[in-house]
Each structure stands twice: as structure tokens, then as C-alpha cells.
């Protein structure tokens, strides 16, 4: 049963889905804005094996310094494991991911963000998600100071216990805010030029 379900997952139809917002975004050209307000900052030309990236108009971090790049496959892939059955798509994921990381690093170094931590390094966080089985895979990269839950950060926090004996740690809520239009446009133009 488990193998049957897994085989079904990795052999799903990755074709364009009219009801998927990310499939629709994959048809846009570099520099165009999505209905959400993100800007397409790079795009591969291969519809079967390509990836595209957007700059989000919102951040969960400091709106004066932080930003989020989201990379997505052009085909409608639901789960990262599906890349194992398409070697070219997997290779192009590696290229898209590393290029996005390079672009973030370049901007952070130019803005001296590496001087904000004791190691004097550029810190980049990332995560990928699919909230339900039909959702288009998307992976986000962002400056590390952006709020993000990591094991090593939270294992040293004071553990609280609620009335039902459930353990938890206190944390500040992450609230997305819109990046100033001037900075957003600057970042979009800069990222497009870096990712050419």
C-alpha cells in the first residue's frame, strides 16, 4: 500500500492546472507582476524541466532590510520527492536554488548585512512547503534574520508548560508586512539583473 501510494505520488501529472495560481504565474515573463503582487525575477525557458522565481511584496522580517525569494518548478510538482524521477528538473532546481542564494548573498553583502552577526557571514534561511496534496511546490529563501523556527535556536529557550502539561516555548508572532514600494522595485530590478 505504501509503495503504491509513493509510486502514485512520483508519477503524478505535472501538467498545467488552470485552478493553480502558481501554474498561472509560470506563464508570466521576467519583470511582470503576479496577482499577489510578486514580481517574476527569473525564469527558465523549458516548460517541462524549468523553474521560475519571484520576489514577494511582503516579508515576515524587517521591511527595511529583509525580503523573500520564492522558487517554483514550471511544471505542477506537488512534492520535493517528485524531483527524483526527473533528472533535468532536479538539475535545474539545483541551479535555480543556487542562483537565488547567490543573488541574496550579493545584495546582503552590498548592504553589509554580514556585519550584523558575530561570525561576519551572510546567513540565508530557506523552507519549502505544500499545505495539501494538490498544492504546487514552492521553496522560499530569505535573509537569515527573517523570523524562522530552527531547532538549535529554540532548544535553548525556556520551556513553558500549559495546564494540560504540554510543553512549548514563547516566541514572537511572525506578521507579514508590505515592503516599501521604492525598496521593492529596487530589489526586483537588482535581482533581475543578477539573475540574467
Predicted regions and their residues:
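HIT superfamily nucleotide-processing domains
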Residues: 1-196
Amino acid at each position: 500500500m505504501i509503495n503504491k501510494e509513493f509510486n502514485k505520488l512520483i508519477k503524478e501529472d505535472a501538467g498545467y492546472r488552470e485552478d493553480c495560481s502558481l501554474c498561472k504565474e509560470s506563464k508570466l515573463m521576467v519583470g511582470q507582476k503576479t496577482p499577489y503582487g510578486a514580481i517574476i525575477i527569473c525564469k527558465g525557458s523549458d516548460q517541462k524541466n524549468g523553474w521560475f522565481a519571484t520576489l514577494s511584496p511582503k516579508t515576515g522580517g524587517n521591511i527595511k532590510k529583509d525580503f523573500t525569494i520564492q522558487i517554483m518548478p514550471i511544471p505542477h510538482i506537488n512534492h520535493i520527492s517528485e524531483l527524483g524521477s526527473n533528472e533535468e528538473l532536479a538539475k535545474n532546481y539545483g541551479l535555480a536554488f543556487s542562483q537565488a542564494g547567490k543573488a541574496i548573498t550579493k545584495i546582503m553583502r552590498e548592504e553589509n548585512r554580514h556585519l550584523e552577526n558575530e561570525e561576519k557571514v551572510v546567513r540565508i534561511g530557506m523552507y519549502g512547503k505544500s499545505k495539501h496534496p494538490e498544492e504546487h511546490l514552492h521553496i522560499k529563501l530569505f535573509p537569515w534574520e527573517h523570523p524562522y523556527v530552527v531547532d538549535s535556536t529554540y532548544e535553548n529557550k525556556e520551556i513553558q508548560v500549559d495546564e494540560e502539561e504540554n510543553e512549548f516555548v514563547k516566541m514572537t508572532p511572525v506578521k507579514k508586512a508590505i515592503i516599501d514600494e521604492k525598496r521593492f522595485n529596487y530589489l526586483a530590478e537588482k535581482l533581475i539583473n543578477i539573475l540574467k
